[in-house]
Amino acid sequence: DKIVGPGNIYVATAKRAVFGQVGIDMVAGPSEILVVCDGATDPDWIAMDLFSQAEHDEDAQSILLSWDADFLDRVAASIERLLPSMERETIIATALRGRGAMILARDLDDAIAVANRIAPEHLELSVEDPQAIVGRIRHAGAIFMGRYTAEAIGDYCAGPNHVLPTSRTARFSSPLGVYDFQKRSSLIMASAAGAAQLAKTASVLARGEGLTAHARSAEYRGAVEPAAEPGLS
């Protein structure tokens, strides 16, 4: 009844094709990382964090956001120096050219606003006090807090689910979790007195829509005098 889990473009296309006949968790796109950094983290660490998503796929998205222009330059230098040592150099280079960016924000507030607009799959808060700003992050699949919390440990062993919303869908969806394997039913039970009270409202609304059977179904149980049909005196 439901298909869940990650996959490549073929899996995503298949899930989209059967949606409506069965349930799905989400249609996931290429991997994404957004790093918000105050400029005090080792630039080699940040460069490798960007590589960690870029090596997945040539369409992967890797973005660094900082309000320290000198730090952006240092990370750019780290990327240039470290890239030739990567086994997936060609894939990483293609991804960074196509969907990589280093963005200079005005300040921390501007960086948070941009991060919420991007709504990334993975968000690293590589700052001195991530607890002070995490409450202002509204849209992100998984949030990695502090300089030592690399996205890679979330991929493999830190514990969060690795099936995360991509392509800005973190604005309205969440990581795969136990609630994706549950469903709910609404329960309604009215007493005779309750039916009599609610029938008055239901009758007026139903007759206003011209749905007489709805109205009379409620009126029978509530012993309500039928409301006048719209337009009739």
From Swiss-Prot:
Active site: E121 (proton acceptor), H122 (proton acceptor)
Reaction catalyzed: L-histidinol + 2 NAD(+) + H2O = L-histidine + 2 NADH + 3 H(+)
EC number(s) on file: 1.1.1.23
Any GO BP annotation: L-histidine biosynthetic process
Binding of substrate, residues: S31, Q53, H56, H122, D155, E209, H214
Cofactor binding annotation: Binds 1 zinc ion per subunit.
Known cofactor(s): Zn(2+)
One Gene Ontology term of the molecular function aspect: histidinol dehydrogenase activity
Residues where Zn(2+) binds: Q53, H56, D155, H214
Pathway as given in its UniProt record: Amino-acid biosynthesis; L-histidine biosynthesis; L-histidine from 5-phospho-alpha-D-ribose 1-diphosphate: step 9/9
InterPro entries with a match to the protein in the record: Ald_DH/histidinol_DH, Histidinol_DH_CS, Hstdl_DH
Any Pfam family matching the protein: Histidinol_dh
Keyword annotations of the record: Amino-acid biosynthesis, Histidine biosynthesis, Metal-binding, NAD, Oxidoreductase, Zinc
One Gene Ontology cellular component: cytosol
Its job: Catalyzes the sequential NAD-dependent oxidations of L-histidinol to L-histidinaldehyde and then to L-histidine.
Family recorded in the similarity comment: Belongs to the histidinol dehydrogenase family.
Protein name as annotated: Histidinol dehydrogenase
Protein species of origin: Thiocapsa roseopersicina
Upper lineage: Bacteria, Pseudomonadati, Pseudomonadota, Gammaproteobacteria, Chromatiales
